[in-house]
Amino acid sequence: VVMLRHMSIANTEVVKGVWRQHVGGLLSGRTIGVIGCGFVGKDLISLLQPWNCELLAHDILNFKDFYYENNVQAVSLEALLSRSDVVTLHLPLTKSTQNILCSKKLRLLKRNAILINFARGGLIDEVEVKSMLKKGELAGAAFDVFETEPPVDVELLNLPNFFGTPHIGGSAI
């Protein structure tokens, strides 16, 4: 929602004394791709139910009953990437998931897509994401985790269409 509503850019501008109202997008009606449907992925799918989103999922396991009950389409990774408006990762970092979103896979994303990684660093080619964000080939990205923490790529962190947090996704009381 932060990315769809341009909240990060708006906050930066307000702090600098710039009062400009950005026109953002709504979550409702979007196609959301969930990569990894363990506990967190399933919780997210449940939370998205009221927003009338088209829900796509990719996982090594088939959660057939859960998908049916929550109106989720199980699809290939390639189909999920090419069809989704928002792609969110919920995977462990293993040999099979490391760099799962390599340059070739990232190129399947729509230009207006938003990429979210609150799972693990090392799942996404961060250099390619930065390049795509700079060229307007990806609308936005939000990461809570990075391949190297703290991240050393200050250029990525300072892009107006990037939102980063310091690995706090699981920090709650």
Question: What are these model-predicted stretches?
Answer:
Residues 23, 149-173:
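C-terminal helix-to-coil terminal segments
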Residues 61-155:
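Rossmann-like adenosine-cofactor binding region
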Residues 37-38:
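Glycine-rich Rossmann-fold phosphate-binding loop(s) that bind the pyrophosphate
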Residues 45, 49, 133-134, 157:
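Gly/Ala-rich phosphate-binding loop of Rossmann-like dinucleotide-binding domains
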Residues 1-31, 43-50:
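Phosphate-binding beta-alpha-beta segment of Rossmann-like dinucleotide-binding domains, i.e.
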Residues 55-59:
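Short beta-strand "acidic-cap" motif of Rossmann-like dinucleotide-binding folds
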Residues 51, 70, 158-160:
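Short, structured coil segments at secondary-structure junctions
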